[in-house]
Amino acid sequence: MMKQCDTAHGGELFVTDLDGTLLGADSRVSPRSAAMLSELTRRGALITAATARTPATVEPLLADTEIHVPAVVMTGAGLWDHAARRFASLRLMDSADAKRVTELTLRLGLHPIVYRAEPDGSHLTFRFDPTGMPSEQYRFITDRANLELKRPVVTADPVGEAAEGPTVLILAMGSDDAVMAAVKALRGNPALSVSYYTDPVYPGVAFLEVFGPRVNKAEGLRELKRLTGAERLTVFGDSFNDLSMMNVADRAVAVENALPEVKAAADTVIGPNTDDSVALFIARELGHTDLL
């Protein structure tokens, strides 16, 4: 159940993507940006992030940033309350759909990972069967094995884990051909949000992500706008997955290093992510020139 946010009031809500937008070249929030955003929040500004990341990596990134508005995480599947350290809301998969998706991935020779939420909303578990998993795919697992808010669970029955739920995400890994076959089979089902990607960190591995219905950053922002009572929405982005939230914003802002298509869709283009550009823009827009 979604609760009204403690910071709820009218005004403008500022939402920034993380990677390539708020985060600098070292993939961190700079001390200057963290200090500025924290002080703006203390002065009443509504500021938060929207990202494909899970809370397990969002939480340490925002550790020095005192923001009170929940962050849109997992591409819109959840709102993460940074102050309370738990989910404010989640968009779950139907258990029967989660079961069918997991069965399909196994038939296609993929290795599914079932992301489930704990009942108290404090963290996620990701459940997987390592049997026969190639080394590059298993490295994806081990890279995430020591995160406080995303805990691994080995299982011999991923289908049963998905059916039992509550399931937030089915992530499956395998060859490009097998993943594309799964995408073709699943895309077009209104009960599912399906995407495909590769990651140069894991060469030769393709990834399938399947969430419940209408999971994207735009839907997450609509929910967040209702939650905060904000009258206007300004978003910041750099990549293709930011376009959906830019389309529902009152004002779309791209950083200088954004993809050309993102800059073309933006109302305003600011400096690069390496120059604290998001924090500086918000401070100027709200008239807090003493922070510049």
Model regions: which residues?
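A short acidic, helix-capping loop that chelates divalent metal ions and anchors anionic groups
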Residues: L22, D81, P203-F207
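Residue-level detector of anion-binding/catalytic polar loops
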Residues: L46, H111, S193, R251-A252, ...
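Short, structured coil segments at secondary-structure junctions
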Residues: T65-I67, T75, N189-P190, V248-A249, ...
